[in-house]
Amino acid sequence: KIFLAIIVIWGIAYLAMFPGIYDYDSIDQTLQFLVTGNVSGHHPVLHSLLLSGFMKIGYVVFHSYEIGLGIFTLLQVLFLAYAAMKVAWFLLQKGYNRLFWFTMCFYLCFPLHYIMSVWDTKDSIFAGFFVLVSLSLIEMADRTSGFWDNRWNLVKFVFVLGGADTKK
């Protein structure tokens, strides 16, 4: 229900700003892969590859870079909504009911959240991974014994830590 509430509100922003906010960094990032072929480390290579890759898929399949950008943006919206849901769910599990409702209102009503969810910049994805790394660290501190016994916890932590490397 938490995820659905976020998706409904942010989905309106996605539809209003389809295929997403394509900013100056995104232009430079996609030029590296789609036009020049000269890839530099000025922007995170993985983010540049994902953004360009989805745009190329959109062009190949639908004859539209915009559709590819829209698919990338949709996946980004879903990922950021998942990260926001994890924060809200964490607060609810810990019994912070008032803080949960405040957080939900903040995620749903503060425009910057849904604008950043459709903004195709590396900062948006970095923010989502930063939230997930922070939640993982809190979970480690809460469960000092037994956290590392579960290999799935290690896999999740390495994944979110690696994903947080989308920012220089």
Q: Which residues fall in each region the model found?
A:
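Short acidic/glycine- and proline-prone juxtamembrane loop motifs at membrane-interface regions
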Residues: 24, 115-125
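Transmembrane signal-anchor helices characteristic of membrane glycosylation enzymes that use polyprenol
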Residues: 1-22
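Specific aromatic-rich, kink-prone transmembrane helix
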Residues: 34, 86, 126-145
